């Protein structure tokens, strides 16, 4: 399902992904609030189209202004426990990891996913990018369905 929203001009490229963080303090009193604040806070989105007919609008948050784009919920790549991980099954993230230098850290704590939620696995990607887990977790890299799919 595609939604039209406004994003900063620097982000306004087809294929760009972002996690919607909600209203910023600079949004108060903005005439474009309804077009800008129409996504679900915490969800990851992918830009599918940049509206070429639209103009760049002034924005108190984005210094170069905002553009109209079409977005859809984006899937999330994440590490989940290997046991029971197969396409179509449900999984939760294994929990926080303090090892931020690990190549798997962005997949163990992916932006746009919460630890206390269950997600449906759409695809098994394969082995995680790390050689071994410093928390001794047996993990598999998967693609989680976008919320609302």
Curated annotation (Swiss-Prot):
It comes from the Archaea. InterPro entries: UPF0179 (IPR005369). Belongs to the UPF0179 family. This is UPF0179 protein rrnAC1064.
